[in-house]
């Protein structure tokens, strides 16, 4: 299987590359700056989305602002990627936004919903950009899946996770980046949650 990963140089992106490599995938890794990698199954690229997605079986988008105050770019970049996918006939798309993005009160505990409401007000531009990103994905005609994790950690893989459109997250919910990466690669293979927003957290 061949996948294209946008945001491959970030902390989650690196875990995606590792998970894809472990599954024997070949990868086109897209980043803002050209990177190098000794792994022959990974080809790094920058710039044009069209050349990056060409020939891919699935496209994974895991980029995001480094801080909530960064200039919003997620919706615009995603729109360009979706356009390139249509042009090249690529139909499988997976993306990470976040558990605080959008209007999902049934997936949040009361306290987490209060926090999400405050975050959406405090970082309005960034959160509206993420919501627009989700809207673009959901209104597209491709086979999409959106992953909505709570707090991401850099710890070791916990192994067991809970994932699905009805999962609830709370103030203590978290997931290791390695586990989220493994879940995304598994979904790219199996297509269990096509056309759904998937909340995901560690099962502990």
Segments the model singles out, each with a brief description of its role:
Residues 40-57:
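Conserved Rossmann-fold cofactor-binding substructure of NAD(P)-dependent oxidoreductases
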Residues 1-23:
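N-terminal Rossmann NAD(P)H-binding glycine-rich loop of SDR-like oxidoreductase domains
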Residues 11, 15, 68, 153:
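NAD(P)H-binding Rossmann-fold N-terminus in SDR/SDR-like oxidoreductases
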Residues 134-156:
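Conserved beta-loop-beta element that borders a ligand/cofactor-binding pocket
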Residues 156-161, 187-196:
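Glycine/proline-rich active-site loop of Rossmann-fold NAD(P)-dependent oxidoreductases
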Residues 30-34, 46:
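N-terminal Rossmann-fold cofactor-binding loop
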Residues 66-95, 132:
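NAD(P)-cofactor binding segment of oxidoreductase domains
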Residues 73, 147, 173-185:
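Substrate-positioning beta->alpha
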